[in-house]
Amino acid sequence: MAVALSRPAGESKVAQLTLRDVKRDPRVRTYIEKANEQMTAIGYTEHGFRHAGIVAGVARGIPRQLGLARRESELASIAGYLHDIGNVINRCNHPETGALLSQSILGDLGMDLSEIAVIMGAIGNHEEDNGFPINAVTAAVIIADKSDVHFSRVQNPNPLTFDIHDRVNHAVHKSYLRVDPENRVISLELTVDTESASVMEYFEIFLMRMVICRRAAEVLDCKFKLVINDHDL
């Protein structure tokens, strides 16, 4: 389902909250740090500053490369950076709790209420279980989050105790999200060591993620494509 997308015509010159401003807030730094400590304790892959930074950067780049408004790119980057802070409370329902935490932080920083609402919606809808790409900002955050598959996310030091999530992430040596604005195609290109994890194992845990990525791409008036070891899937 495609939605109307705003274009970079006549953008406001009023000073607005940026990702740099958000990163400076001590609550943001502490919540991300403690959220990842909780993820480590329960055996999950990395959800700390590395993941937050990558998702913020990719989420910023998607609207920008598609020619959308500059402010949409900035809002996507802020939502991408904050999307997992709800894990500081509990992994369960972290999109909802993260959205509420972001409301408090961004409100204190003086962000416009309409922009806070956009970011809350993006954070609250970023998971494949019950999320939906409600707008371009949310779509960018979803794709950016789900495309961060990489061996560096594995926090378990013992390969003998890897679960399927660890094996699949550990097997991905290279991950790149390619945006082709001319042909309206967004491609997730992975280099996977199939001796560490099979392509079928990848699909076993990532099928629903790829479905929501396809929906997100449609909102951006694009097609989503998965490429593993130079093969289109």
Label each residue range with its predicted role.
Residues M1-A4, E128, T194-S198:
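Charged, low-complexity surface segments at secondary-structure and domain boundaries
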Residues M39-A41, R50-H51, R64-V179:
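Divalent metal-dependent catalytic cores for phosphoryl transfer on phosphate-bearing substrates
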Residues A59, A140, C213:
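Aromatic/hydrophobic pocket-lining residues that form π-stacking "cages" and hydrophobic walls in ligand
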Residues D148-L233:
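Terminal helices and disordered tails flanking the catalytic cores of nucleotide-processing hydrolases
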